C-alpha cells in the first residue's frame, strides 16, 4: 500500500473569534485580515514544499470555504469538494453565544462538556464520529494527498481518536486558527508528522524532502 499524506487544517481566524463567540453552525463566520493572511501563508508554505494535493475536502461553513479558496489559490488541488462531515459542531441555541455558556450549562446538568447535547444539537462525541467516518473513507481511497479543511473542535476530536486519548485531553489537541496537522498513513498505524503547527512555524518544519 502506498503512503498517503493527509493534512488537517483549521480555518483561519474569524471576526467572531476575536469577539469570543462560539460560532458552531449558527454563525458561518468571516475571516479577519489576519486570518486571511495566515491561510495564504499556509498555502504558500505547502506549495513551496512541493505538496501536490489530489483532493481538498472542505467544511460547508463560510469560514471553511473562504479558507479553502485561499489554500486552493496556492495549491491548485485536482478536486475540491464540500463534505458535510467536516462541518462545525451543531451547538443548538448555544451557537453564536459567548463560549463560557456551554461550560456553565454542562456544569448545571452535571455532565462532562463533551457529552453535552443541546436539543436538536450534537455532542463532541457525535462530532468525533463523523470526523472519524470521513477519515476512514479517505484512508480507504486511492488519493495520495488529501487536505481536510475543518474546525478546531472536529480536528481535536479526530486527533484524540488518532492518538488514543480521551476527552480529558481535548483542550491539548485543539488547533489554533490556521493550525495544521500532517499525518502519514501507509499501513495499520497512522504516523503524525506535525500536530497543530502554527503558520509561523511551518517554514522551518516543511521542506521538499519531507512534506510529500
Language-model features: where?
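Short beta-strand scaffold positions
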Residues: 58-59, 129, 149-150
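Acidic, low-complexity terminal tails and accessory targeting/binding regions
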Residues: 1-5, 48-49, 77, 89-100, ...
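Active-site-proximal alpha-helix that buttresses catalytic centers in soluble enzyme cores
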Residues: 3-5, 9-78
Amino acid at each position: 500500500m502506498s503512503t498517503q499524506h493527509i493534512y488537517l487544517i483549521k480555518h483561519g481566524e474569524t471576526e467572531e473569534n476575536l469577539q469570543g463567540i462560539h460560532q458552531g453552525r449558527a454563525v458561518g463566520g468571516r475571516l479577519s485580515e489576519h486570518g486571511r493572511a495566515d491561510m495564504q501563508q499556509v498555502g504558500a508554505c505547502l506549495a513551496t514544499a512541493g505538496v501536490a494535493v489530489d483532493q481538498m475536502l472542505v467544511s460547508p461553513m463560510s469560514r471553511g470555504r473562504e479558507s479553502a479558496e485561499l489554500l486552493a489559490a496556492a495549491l491548485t488541488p485536482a478536486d475540491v469538494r464540500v463534505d458535510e462531515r467536516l462541518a462545525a459542531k451543531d451547538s443548538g441555541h448555544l451557537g453564536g453565544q459567548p463560549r463560557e455558556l456551554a461550560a456553565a450549562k454542562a456544569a448545571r446538568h452535571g455532565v462532562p462538556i463533551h457529552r453535552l447535547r443541546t436539543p436538536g444539537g450534537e455532542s463532541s462525541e457525535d462530532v468525533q464520529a463523523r470526523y472519524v467516518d470521513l477519515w476512514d473513507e479517505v484512508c480507504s481511497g486511492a488519493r495520495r494527498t488529501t487536505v481536510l479543511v475543518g474546525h478546531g473542535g472536529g480536528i481535536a476530536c479526530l486527533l484524540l481518536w488518532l492518538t488514543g486519548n480521551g476527552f480529558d485531553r481535548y483542550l491539548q489537541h485543539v488547533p489554533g486558527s490556521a493550525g495544521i496537522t500532517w499525518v502519514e498513513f501507509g499501513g495499520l498505524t497512522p504516523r503524525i508528522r506535525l500536530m497543530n503547527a502554527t503558520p509561523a512555524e511551518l517554514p522551518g518544519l516543511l521542506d521538499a524532502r519531507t512534506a510529500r
